Amino acid sequence: MEATRAAFDEAITLRQAKKLIQCMAHEQSFLLLSAPGMGKSEMVYEAAREAGLPCRSLLGTQIAPEDVSGVPRIVGERSVFCPPRILLPERAEPFCLFLDELPACAPDVQKAFYSLLLERRLGEHALPPGTWVVAAGNRLQDRALVRAMSSALVNRVTILHLRVDTVEWLAWAQRTGIRNEIRRFVTAIPDALMRPVPAEPVPFSTPRAWALLSRAFDMAQKSGLLNNETRRALAFGRLSPEDAVVFCALAEEAIGAIQPLEEYFCKPDLLPMGDAARWFILDCIRQFVRDGKADGFKPRVVNRFLRSLSSEHQLTLLADMVAKWGALGADRAMFDLLRKVAAA
């Protein structure tokens, strides 16, 4: 059973999740799960805006059970629970109720959400027809503040596991004004968009981190503060160290627009002259070949490109990938030369 499940990828992109929410969140409640910093909250707000719904949010870590069920007041000989205004506004119009960090809620708070998630009710009060109920949170493996969810809660929602899609994010980044150098960097190194959550609580690269870094650069530049030193401080304060060091080195060398990797194959003269920039492009080409994206090149193009490089750079590209380059038609003589260089 586990092997069968492993053959399928149940995770979907933010764009796919948004369409599902807009399609059926008025009847079925959703729980969005992913690593921190993917942009779940922004996606929910965007989905609600597009549907013309106001979005009201509750942060799971900052509420108590009575914040959900309401507080009692005496009416005649009976006690009546008064629901909170954020969950049940005076005007009976549909809205988007966003329950952020639901998996981080205390067990009593999770129980208070049962009828809200399944029946769209707060005690004797029903949510306005057409109201969305969407929750979000992190997973146990993300080293975030997460509590075990009860089976009763899980059975009341549709759980959507989310994954990062680089093309999707780049389109969003262009629409929202993310800086060109950040978009170029992520285009060249897609893995830099979302790094694994580190074991220690240190900065790491996520879509949110890149977006906030772009905004920080804009503010620093507007105030005349953006230089090499402040760029490094801001980048290392937001990103994974391996991304921050390469990003800053490229920015300081003013590499300019990064060409499609196919262009460097066909026109090696386009490779940047600066050491950091050249190493960066060659590392991207190495990944390009490893992923099988260079399979369409003719052997003469491959060999012309390799011969244009120094022995050191050739060794960098071919190390541990002799079979890959051999399948592309790289000359045997080049491999012999590299063996001599490596043995020297």
Model feature map: region roles:
Residues 1-189:
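AAA+ P-loop NTPase catalytic core and its hallmark functional loops
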Residues 132, 169-172, 210, 279, ...:
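A residue-identity detector for tryptophan
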Residues 166-169, 207, 276, 322:
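Intrinsically disordered regions, especially transient/low-confidence alpha-helical propensity segments
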Residues 175-316:
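Alpha-helical lid/collar subdomain of P-loop NTPases
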